[in-house]
Amino acid sequence: IGQACEFDYSSSIALKTLKNLGYEVVLLNSNPITINTDKALAYKTYIEPINTQNVLKIVEQEGIEAILPTMGGQTALNIMVELHQQGHFEGALKHVKLLGAKIESILKAEDRRAFKECMLNIGLDLPKGGYAYSEEEALGVVKEVGFPCIIRSSFTLGGEGSSVAFNIEEFRDLAKFALEASPISEILIEESLLGCKEFEMEVVRDRKDNCVIVCCIENVDPMGIHTGDSITIAPALTLTDKEYQRMRDASFAVLRAVGVDTGGANVQFAIKDRRLLVIEMNPRVSRSSALASKATLFPIAKVATLLALGHTLEEIQNDITQSTTCFEPTLDYIITKIPHFDFEKFPQVDTTLGTSMKSIGEVMGIGGSFKESLMKALESDYLLKNLHAFLEQPLELEFLKKELRRPNPKRLLYAMHAFSDSLSVDEVHSLSFIDPYFLNEIKEIVQALLELKEADKQALLSDKNTLFGLKSMGLSDALIASFLGIAELEVRQAREALELHPKMYQVDLSANEFKSPTPYLYSTYAPFFPSHKAPPKSTRQKVILIGSSANKIGVGMEFDYALTHASLALKKMGLSPIIINNNPETISTDHDTSDTLYFEPITLEHVLEIVARERDHLLGVVVGFGGQTPLKIAKDLEALNIPLLGTAFKNIEIAEERDLCHQLLDSLQITYPRGLCANSKTQALECLDQLELPLILRPSFVLGGAKMRILRTKEECLDYIENYSFETSLLMDSFLEDALELDVDAICDLKSVFVCSVLEHIEPAGIHSGDSTCFIP
């Protein structure tokens, strides 16, 4: 948590940049499902544990002259600190240069005490607080600070060890936990800033002291929630120009004082009663750097790598604009990032969000307005699927107020429910501390949806202006249909009859002031900008690749790895790959991985708009490299005569639909555990009577073992069946005790099947293969 695809993205870009300059780069990484460990990228790759011993061994064996630690997240920085503490930079690493960040800078930024002293020395304001190295010292500090207070561990990532304490009983336990989480047993105890506005500045600086703000990111959620768990937007919408300029100047001062002379950094601020407070900084590329790069098309990882080598901003050319990188991006669109949580897999877990990160992925929506951007992001994470039913569901006022007070992944939806229950913006703001500007925008969306329930369906669907107004708010066909009580197809047909389609605009750094040749596109129904010309389309044969969206449990870097390689393979074949994805952390959403990138929700509506635009010379759509996400729309695509390249949907269905799979195995005379398939509660209860316990119950069309259970009693089975939706069929299998599990990977070219590998699991059957230790051969 807190360290995912974004560091594979930044390190891969760094490797590519260094290689193009003629450097021989040696990579140390222990994660095999990354692009950066591909043989083609580094001169040599060591898939070994990342520890000081291996760093020293590689430096000696390979004659290493410099180390670039700013692309590997907290792991890389902490290893540098360990090497420093062990005295190796005065010994074995004496002649090795550290690029991007000096040891002194890392210590100043990551050590809470040193950072605070550094900020006070340059006259910047910080939350009042103190440091502690033991439980006794912590109790002394909290007497001065008072409650509620925020506890932060030094040298950790993703807010590990951080928390908010509201009383002395909570404080004792949380302080002990935070001290254990810090590798140097140091914690910072600060005044609470709960409810204050939070901002992040992505900054780059070169050796000549040229500084550029790449992006100002505003957190929609107030302080008290880790930025990785917050809904964020860019550019900032509620800052005054005076506040922005103060923050900009403070960011430059922070980089100078800490000593980030050649590279990128992330600086976080809070605003409390007109006080501008510095919260922390990361002296490296971060999760927010990847988001800022995708939001602005400013290649932070590449620029930070070149700056680390001593280049200046005026010397570095931006590949996209073909001009210098020494100017600050200007956006004429809004991006919204929504974090993805997988709490439903862990029903016992507390879903309250705090200063320690809990999300495992994120999606980004791009639109011409905040409303459109927000709704596209919510749609990208499939959070609007049951919005109509959720708003119809009666909730007690006290429960609603409690959920608005409590930071949680559904708080935005509870705000929508509050507006549907006639609560005012002021009331929701006083409970949630979300800025009234955002709440007013959300309220207008809810009012538009509620009006649909009373609308004359035929009149609305034949009125182009009304439908355009709804679409420009970011409302999907499916969402409009659910509130009208009709099928999504009817809304789509109405739009087609009215010739109402979104415009495709290019993401660029200059609000279309300079020509951008990069086909990195988003759709919008926002009013047309005359200066925006339609982006060019490829005249070569094209293939659309659909991505996997947000990282989830069971959907991680491995799908981005596959998607990226598929795109590169198509390029080698002379074809034009088009990627549809909405995950800002990934390499597949980098502007040069494909010939055209659409940063869009992976839904039938958006994919069909893209297919219609790219229909000339289109060979087909590939759904096999995005995990379960593209498979959800594969059937509809095939039904609309859009060719699916690779496995046909009827064959995907045989593999995913348990009953069809059993029929195939029977025809091939292959044995499998005795099992039955149920499509309703009644059928499931009948199957239960025919099978012996224990059972393994599995839905069709799921990934990562979602909702799969091993059940050993009839009562457990009855409870599971009672709560199962039966949207897809349920397979009820006899569970094989003490069985050996194997994974076989194979590829087929219609004639031959080639077995690539056989993995043997150490754990017995019943433990998901993603959680099982395995070995080859």
Model feature map: region roles:
Residues I1-I35, K39-N54, I58-I64, T75, ...:
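ATP-dependent carboxylate activation and anion-phosphoryl transfer catalytic cores
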Residues M473, L479-F483:
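Extended, domain-scale alpha-helical bundle/helix-rich regions
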Residues L28, T70, A101, G129-A132, ...:
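Structural motif
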Residues A487-H501:
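Charge-enriched amphipathic alpha-helical scaffolds
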Residues A92-S162, T647-M708:
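A conserved helix-loop-beta module that forms one wall/lid of the active-site cleft
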Residues E65-M71, L618-F625:
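Periplasmic-binding protein-like
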